[in-house]
């Protein structure tokens, strides 16, 4: 993988994780983070530039979905779960 391509993948990975942290719901937040990490680990050894480009486009589309869902999540926030409340760690 070219250095610029690697940097682009890392930027996208960090952006996906950052946006996933915005979910107020513990369940959505942990699910999104787990799925992102699993997907990137699964595809880390791919060397085919066409396949990398295809996966990057898919990840960019997923980033847009996560951003949109994060905004909706904040508009209709619910009460925090017991495990999310201070003092319950």
Swiss-Prot record:
Sorted UniProt keywords: Coiled coil, Mitochondrion, Nucleus
Database matches in Pfam families: Complex1_LYR (PF05347)
Biological-process GO terms, alphabetical: iron-sulfur cluster assembly
Pathway(s) per entry: Cofactor biosynthesis; iron-sulfur cluster biosynthesis
Coiled coil start-end: 44-71
Location(s) in or outside the cell: Mitochondrion; Nucleus
One cellular component (GO) term of this entry: nucleus
Major site of localization recorded for this protein: mitochondrion
Role summary: Required for nuclear and mitochondrial iron-sulfur protein biosynthesis.
Family under the similarity heading: Belongs to the complex I LYR family.
Protein name, UniProt field: LYR motif-containing protein 4
Organism whose genome encodes this protein: Taeniopygia guttata
């Amino acid at each position: 993988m070219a250095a610029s391509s690697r940097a682009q993948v890392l930027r996208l990975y960090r952006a996906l994780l950052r946006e996933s942290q915005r979910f107020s719901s513990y369940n959505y937040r942990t699910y999104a983070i787990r799925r992102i990490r699993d997907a990137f680990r699964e595809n880390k050894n791919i060397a085919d530039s066409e396949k990398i480009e295809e996966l990057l486009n898919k990840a960019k589309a997923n980033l847009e979905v996560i951003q949109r869902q994060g905004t909706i999540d904040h508009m209709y926030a619910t009460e925090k779960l017991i495990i999310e409340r201070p003092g319950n760690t």
